[in-house]
Amino acid sequence: MINIKNILIVCISLVMYSIVFSSCKSDDIASGIFEIATKDLVVDVDKESTTVYIPVNSSLTINDWEVDYDKSWITHGKKRNSLVLSFEANPGKTKRTAAIKVTSPVAEYTLAINQYGPNDVVITDDKDVRVKPTSGIGTNPSGSNTIECTWDGSPRPYMTYTVPATLEYFFSGTEVIDYIIYAPTSTGNFGKLKLYTATAENPEYTLKGEYNFEMKSESSTIHFTTGIKATKIKFEVQEGKNNMAGCSEMEFCTKTITLTQQLLNVFADITCSELKPDINDDAIEELPAEYFKRIAYALKNNRYSEWEKEFRVQEYKAYSNNEEWATKLKIKKYTDLDNPTGISVEKGDELIVLVGDTHNQSIYLECIDEETTSSNDDHEYQRPAAHGHTFSLKPGVNKLVMTSSGQLFLIYTADIFSPDAQPIKIHIPLGSGKVTGYFDTEKHKTNEKYAELLSKATHKYFCIRGERIMFYFHTDKLQEVVPHKILPSIDFWNNIIKWEQELMGIEDIQPSQMNNHLMAISPEGSYMWANDYRIAFAKSTLYKILIPEKVMSAKDNVWGPAHEIGHVHQGAINWPSCTETSNNLFSNYVLYKLGKYCSRGLEISKLADAYGLKRSWVELGYSELYMRMQWQLWNYFHRLGNMPNFFPELFKELRANPLTFNNPGLAQLQYAKAVCKVANMDMTEFFERWGFFREVMLMNYEDYGKYMYIVNQGMIDQAKVYMATFSKKVPPIYYLEDRKNGDVGIEDYKVGDVGYYTQFQDNVKITGTPTYKLSGSKITVNNGTQAVAFEVRKGNENGELLYFFNFLSYTLPQTVLVDGIKFYAVQADGKRIEMKEE
């Protein structure tokens, strides 16, 4: 009985406790927090399958609230602070809707779901009207196709054999022309041109504008700020592809304004990025397409997320013509993809692009996809393409169909000094492409913002724009290597480019006149390379170059990228035999500026060996040796302060008077003469040591191409006569060395005991009497530390030079016969002192 009584007491107690606990818990739930913000109660999604996260501010567990809906194309999940909604792709042609009820003991909410169908913007009904000329005349055609072929709608092109060329069109003067579309041919594509117009009120031609179609294979468009009733229009084509002028079709068009007027009844401007004041739902419902209603409601109800809007609505600035500046500066072409949009697309996507005032400038969207290549590797791999399909944009509504997947870049090339080179506002609205974002150091500024944008990126590649360089690297690799900080990386490489640019003397040009960027990509194969439009660092190498501390941890981590960027900049000082070495002037300069590692390149003893064998410059045989010639010049003129602007001035001289690249023997001597001219110095001895004055005839010399490499005695004599016109002679800087054994980064080089640059800097004199001992072919020098080198000559100090060395103990090569020779210690100023045998 006692046990039964006790059991009953325990059971009753448990029931009472459960009732009390349940009551307390219910009270806790009822007084808890469960909130969904008003702005999140309407969910707009595109037609593609997607997942969205609705923020929930809740103190409840996920079991305390319920989600209910009746649509099979929706699924959901619950997290502590969010409702996860997934939507299947909309297969229909129109918007579909749903209601989702979210119920809790604290509050209830109903979410309105709008999943849009395909783009329903129709602009064909308002198709612009083509104004046909009444007649025309042009420069004599190359065949039977006359200028009439440019407006007859046929594929027959009009072509002239020469430029300049003139195309002149006549009109009734009663129809307004708002813009002109030029369709090129397969050759003769227009470059620079002038456009003249006349009207009934002003019957004489007046210059309407100067344009550059850049000889593109795509159509180009000229937009008039205000339409004109032209009586005649004249094109003066100043340059064309292959020195010809060709036109497949010239369309003169009048814009219809119905759609524009409807949009401007609701939106503040044609970019549709802002509503007019006091716009109500009735006005929005009058818009001609569901597409524009979506934009309007998103703006009105604050449902256009700031992240989306930042990239979908932008003002794009003008960038200089990278092709023109490459020619002027003797460099490889920088990128023209300076304006990322942060929008990615898939092949077949329909896009609406809303363009504001273009200020009479031509602009394009370019879609950058991937390309498959194998380069020199044994396997194919992917990398971003240098170029993609371009779409000409006009002010107002543009409807485009993407021909490939990729990211979009706005191409806005102009004379950046022109008052018309103003920023252009463009809106790529909701439902057109997908926001992936990009990071811009000028706009976004902080590492925190970078980390946020990178974490939201949706595309395979993420774009980072700095002052002078752009990265277009794999998103996953950036998230792995630099997930939180990018400013140290971008600043590091901006500095390297800045240093290279200052060495080539364009600090007054870039970025004030030429503001294009260098673009770096991350191929999935190869290693590192440079070409027009981009430089490449393989995806597998990004960990080496994106963290400055990692870059500085190994000499080659700096050298490789600086070498590739040097390829972009070497043009003015390059000729066949130097392609893989003249760029290393920049690499060594970058090492010097960073301050940790010594310079790179073979020792002077290797030059001595080549000299002793009477080898010419082109036959020196070591790429690591060639680079020392330029570096000796830099040390003498820059480091020693003899002419701190020497290389900038040399680059300017060689841009004004370029080397004859296809005649490398001549180019070699042109370079030597240019050095003399800029330095105002007789550099004969310097270039004599480097083999410039040895005859050579190589009929099939290879250096990224085949060349005839000829240097004959007549060419040599002519160069020497020119050099002799300069009264000041160069000191023996061909013996200058800026490294000592044991320097950080010296590697396996044995650089000698004398000739260090400070001896030239201090103009050290030989105060003692250098002596030597010979034991077979081994020579030991005593009291010679004040010399910069030691020479082996026949006869006196002006006798034939057989060999030289910069060690105090050295084994002479077997080609140097010790009988009948003399040894001389060379002083920093060039004085030779005969050494006595002990």
Give residue ranges: language-model regions.
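Beta/coil-rich, acidic/histidine-enriched accessory regions frequently appended to metallopeptidases
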Residues: 259-261, 266, 273-305, 667-807, ...
